[in-house]
From Swiss-Prot:
Residues 214-265 are annotated as: Disordered. Its main location: other. It is found in: Vacuole. Residues 278-340 form the t-SNARE coiled-coil homology domain. InterPro entries: PX_dom, PX_dom_sf, T_SNARE_dom. One of its GO terms (molecular function) is SNARE binding. It comes from Schizosaccharomyces pombe (strain 972 / ATCC 24843) (Fission yeast). Residues 1-115 form the PX domain. The keyword Coiled coil applies. PROSITE patterns: PX (PS50195), T_SNARE (PS50192). This is Vacuolar morphogenesis protein 7 homolog. The keyword Transport does not apply. Keywords: Coiled coil, Vacuole.
Amino acid sequence: MALKIKIPETSQSSDEYSRWTVYHIEVAFPNGGKHVVFRRFNEFVALDAQIRPNDYNSRLCKLPSKSWVSSTVTNEKLRESRRLALQAYVQCLSETPWIKMPVVKKFLNIKDESEDETQGQFLGPTDWIQVFQDCKRNLHMYRVDLMSGKSITIGVQTKNVYAIKSLMDNLSESLDKLELANALGPGEILRRKDMLEQLGSEFLSFKRLVKNANSPVAPPSASSQLNSSNPSSPFRPLSASTDKQSNTSLNRVLGKNRMPETQTTKKLDNVGLYNMQNQTMEDQDMQAESLLPIIQRQKELSKMINQEVVEQNSMLDELSNEAYANQKKLHRTRAGLRKLG
């Protein structure tokens, strides 16, 4: 079982009593599949206590010692050094005989037939974004091919629909697991759910396009075309009322709401309108991406400010304790002076 195990990143989690560091263990299988397991440091300690007695030749890496002075929540250097030490530890676990132990398999969330497991791969926070972008890119490409009239068989179109649906299901399941594991903040979870909802709307639109493209269209009969009483007949006499009805029926609808025609859209057919909408959305995406570095910088500043506030609170607590101790000493000194006086 040639596994590649690493700890690429960490995150913070908390409850009403304390905060702690969560280590993201990424397990990659030989077939290309991978998943992420979230563990705390005390879970590493519990695992080591179970398997350390079996280390007769001292081949297993040692766990980093627990620090009673500083915390990985506030000390970034300590958190990084512990991450590297734990990464070396889990890489030792990928070797025989440790990887064959049931307790290690349970710790790494590895099933007995993990080499053949290719479905339902759990995505970490970074992989989730990459798969989402690939899914959106593929959906856009399939839709452009369909709208441009390329000769694509029904089987290929159906395969594309199921491929996108499978990726979206995996994204949804992985996001639920990330939320349960507190691997992402509530704001980021909500943002990614909105991204999935928007992608789902685009997917439903693509499914309707595939269905309409594959459904046979009955040709109009000659009698209906030549019948002047038919409202759509080209031989029907024009009048004010009929012209108004025809204009209303021939308005193109893009999306849910009916948009008024402009000088630009009147010159375009359906494919041109679709390409124009895509170009508009790409421009909006570029504007959003240009704002991303600013938002990330603000996030980093917020984290630095939060860390500074935590350190200042700790210093104030120490100062308060020292002031309380000095006050007690002062009371004792005054009491002694009263006895002497």
